[in-house]
From Swiss-Prot:
Binding site for substrate: 14-15, 81-83, 107-108, 237, 299, 325, 330, 334
This protein's UniProt keywords: Lyase, Purine biosynthesis
Gene: adsl-1
UniProt-recorded Gene Ontology molecular function terms: (S)-2-(5-amino-1-(5-phospho-D-ribosyl)imidazole-4-carboxamido) succinate lyase (fumarate-forming) activity; N6-(1,2-dicarboxyethyl)AMP AMP-lyase (fumarate-forming) activity
Domain of life: Eukaryota
GO BP terms in the entry: 'de novo' AMP biosynthetic process; 'de novo' IMP biosynthetic process
Protein name: Adenylosuccinate lyase
CDD domains to which the protein is assigned, alphabetical: Adenylsuccinate_lyase_2
């Protein structure tokens, strides 16, 4: 059946079809990891003295690890209604010498949970690299525009001047905090290890004739073979699903941060201040050919909503895990976590494309600043007046009255700074303010140095070890 004739997830076929995550989260990789976990278990058991595990059996498993008879596996699972045992039988069929020691002492969650954790870890490693590149691209945009003066906005209304670069590092800070959350999760991530059917390790204690030190060594050795620094000391049949919730929550922070950034970009594109990349042959609307819609930022917002809402499901999976184990988690985890990882990848890929082509509509930005500078100079006037002994509250009241009157006048004509400061109250500071207005950067405070300092002192050091300096620009297929 052709791909177009059946439903497949849009994450893997539309937004992430060229991503390594599609392979990392695939059935083939999962099954390969299960077999690798059986190999590691056999190796560790042999190293610790189990006579029934031979080098011949281990070598046989290694030689057949990637040999899959999927028709046999599917038939076995239909019959047994148990995926791990279906794979166990399939592996044993092609490894007759090892068949008797495959899965020795283990329970299904030994391969299921541990393989999931390896796949999650490898996915996170890729996502962190992508995330670092996204933040780096935004940092470059911010530095390039650190002196481009623009109107700040609070409550979506005109506020004190900022620079485009300073606004950019505000966005970068939100993304960086989400990045740090995910990186911290990755560093603390724990492996399930070998725990047995209910987490007691009784089967392994039996195999090692009651030698607890060897059971502990087995757990530690398999963890090291899987290249994990940390492991759970206590589990039921499964590892705590709270760890899954922490992963999902870390990615939900990415969603929330990205939605804030992309909503801002959409608003600023509507104001005519920014323009997300719009390709030569791109069509904005089938009905309105003149439109340049911020469709990439809109897509990011849609993907972000999926991440923002995901923790609720992860928390219910955690809450419904009964006693040492129930299957309440199984179907949900199979869908939720791969979807969350792929959604994060799709979001970051699109964000990278936006930041690599985001442009400032400088002429319009300058015009908006010129229209508002007559009002925005008044805040600095208030500070100067207080330096001369004027009561701050009195200055605020006069400026408020003057500004509101000028705003009404602005509806029918252009207002300049001399008009807003015509009151004799401003005589002592008027000339100084008028002189400053000729160069609006004078009203942006420490925007330039804040931008430079944040990038140099916090952003770059945080992402440096994850950043691939050779990362290519993103070209979106859709």
């Amino acid at each position: 059946m052709a791909a177009e004739d059946k439903f497949e997830s849009v994450l893997s076929t539309r937004y992430c079809k060229n991503s390594p995550l599609v392979s990392i989260l695939s059935e083939t990789n999962k099954a390969t990891l299960w077999r690798q976990l059986w190999i590691w278990l056999g190796e560790a058991e042999k190293e610790l003295g189990l006579k029934q595990v031979t080098q011949e059996a281990i070598d046989e498993m290694k030689s057949q690890r990637d040999n899959f008879d999927w028709s046999f596996i599917r038939a076995e699972e239909r019959k047994l209604k148990h995926d791990v045992m279906a794979h166990n039988h399939a592996f044993g069929k092609i490894c007759p010498t090892a068949a008797g020691i495959i899965h020795l002492g283990a329970t299904s969650c030994y391969v299921q949970d541990n393989a999931d954790l390896i796949a999650y870890r490898d996915s996170i490693d890729h996502i962190l690299k992508r995330f670092a590149t996204v933040i780096d691209r935004l940092a470059q945009f911010s530095l390039n525009n650190k002196e481009v003066v623009t109107v700040g906005r609070t409550h979506y209304q005109t506020a004190s001047l900022v620079t485009v670069g300073k606004r950019g590092v505000l966005w970068a800070q939100e993304l960086l905090m989400a990045f740090q959350s995910l990186a911290e999760f990755r560093d603390k991530m724990r492996f399930r290890g070998i725990k047995g059917a209910t987490g007691t390790q009784d089967s392994f204690l039996t195999l090692f004739s009651g030698d607890e030190e060897k059971v502990e060594a087995l757990d530690e050795l398999v963890t090291k073979k899987a290249n994990f620094a940390n492991r759970f000391l206590i589990t039921g049949q499964t590892y705590s699903r709270q760890q899954d919730s922490q992963l999902v929550f870390s990615l939900s922070l990415l969603g929330a941060a990205a939605k804030k950034v992309c909503t801002d970009i959409r608003v600023l594109q509507a104001f005519g201040e920014l323009l997300e990349p719009f390709e030569k042959d791109q069509i904005g609307s089938s009905a309105m050919p003149y439109k340049k819609n911020p469709m990439k930022s809109e897509r990011c917002c849609a993907l972000a909503r999926k991440l923002i809402n995901a923790p609720q499901e992860a928390l219910t999976i955690l809450a419904d895990q009964g006693l040492e184990r129930t299957l309440d988690d199984s179907a949900g985890r199979r869908m939720l976590i791969p979807d969350v990882l792929l959604t994060a990848e799709a979001l970051l890929t699109t964000l990278q494309n936006i930041f690599e082509g985001l442009t400032v509509q400088t002429d319009n930005v300058k015009k908006i600043v010129e229209d508002e500078i007559a009002f925005l100079g008044l805040e600095k006037a208030m500070m100067m007046l207080t330096e001369e002994g004027v009561d701050r509250q009195q200055a605020h009241a006069v400026i408020r009255k003057t500004a509101l009157e000028a705003k009404q006048l602005q509806a029918t004509q252009k207002v300049d700074i001399r008009q807003t400061m015509a009151d004799p109250f401003f005589d002592s500071v008027r000339d100084r303010i008028v002189g400053l207005v000729n160069n609006p950067i004078n009203f942006t405070g420490r925007c330039v140095s804040q931008t430079e300092n944040f990038i140099a002192k916090e952003l770059k050091p945080t992402i440096s070890k994850y950043l691939d300096q050779s990362a290519a620009k993103v070209q979106l297929d859709v």
